[in-house]
Amino acid sequence: MQICVTGVVLRSRPLGKNHTLTTLFTPEGLFTFFAKQGQTLQCDYRETLVPISLGKYTLHRNGSRLPKLTHGDILNAFEAIKQTYALLEASGKMIQALLASQWKEKPSHKLFSLFLNFLHRIPESSNPEFFAAIFVLKLLQYEGILDLTPACSLCKASLPYACYRYQGHKLCKKHQHKQAISIEKEEEQILQAIIHAKQFSELLAIAEFPIAIAEKIFYLFDSLQEEKKSERNSSEDPYHEILRLSKVVHPY
C-alpha cells in the first residue's frame, strides 16, 4: 500500500552500513520509515533525509513492517538554519524536546504548525537559544502540564510573581521541591508574557530581553523527562546528525 506523508525530519539514524531509519514530525505525530541506501549517494532522495528538512514522502507500507521510502521531495530545506552552528544547536534543542515528549502517530496539528513557524522565524532572532527555549515553554503549555495560576500548586497560597518551579508545578517557599528552581519576579513576568503572547512578533521581541532564563526553561522540561533519560542515546544528537549528513562545517 502506498501512502504519502508530509513532515519535518527530526533525525536519521544509521541502520547497518548504508541504510537509515528516519523520523518525521508530522501533523499526525511522530512517524518513522526505512530508507534503503539512505546513507549513500545511491539514494536519490538522500537530501530529504537530512534533519530540519520539510519534505513530502511517498512510502510503501507492508503490514506491520516499517514503511519504506520510494520517493521524496524537499519542500523547505531551511538552509538559513544550517548555515550557523548557533541556529543548528537551538533548532536541535527544539527537536530533542519533540522526540522526548511526542508519541508515534499521535495527532498534533497545532503543535506541528507551531514548530514549523518557529523554524521559519528562528533565523530572525539574535538570541536563538532563548527563542528555542520559548518553543519548549510553549510545548509545555500545549501539553497542559504547566501551572499558570498565580498560586502554589499545593497549598494555593498567592504567588503573583516570585516562586519556585519544578516540572509543571508552581510552588511557594514552604512547599518547594528539593530540585525546584527559584524564579525571580522578572523571570516569572517573562514566562507569563511568553505564555500569553499571540503573535510571533511578540515572541521575537521577548527573545531580545537581556535575561538569562533559557536554561531554567530547559531544566523545567528536562525535569519532566527524567524517567526517559536512560532511554536516550547521546550519539543521536540531531544537530550533530545535520553536520554529518549535510557536511556543514563547525565555524569554530
UniProtKB/Swiss-Prot annotation:
Keywords: DNA damage, DNA recombination, DNA repair. One of its GO terms (biological process) is double-strand break repair. The keyword DNA repair applies. It comes from the Bacteria. InterPro entries: ARFGAP/RecO (IPR037278), DNA_rep/recomb_RecO_N (IPR022572), NA-bd_OB-fold (IPR012340), RecO (IPR003717), RecO_C (IPR042242). Disulfide bonds: none annotated. SUPFAM superfamilies: ArfGap/RecO-like zinc finger, Nucleic acid-binding proteins. GO terms for cellular component: bacterial nucleoid. Involved in DNA repair and RecF pathway recombination. Belongs to the RecO family. This is DNA repair protein RecO. It comes from Chlamydia pneumoniae (Chlamydophila pneumoniae).
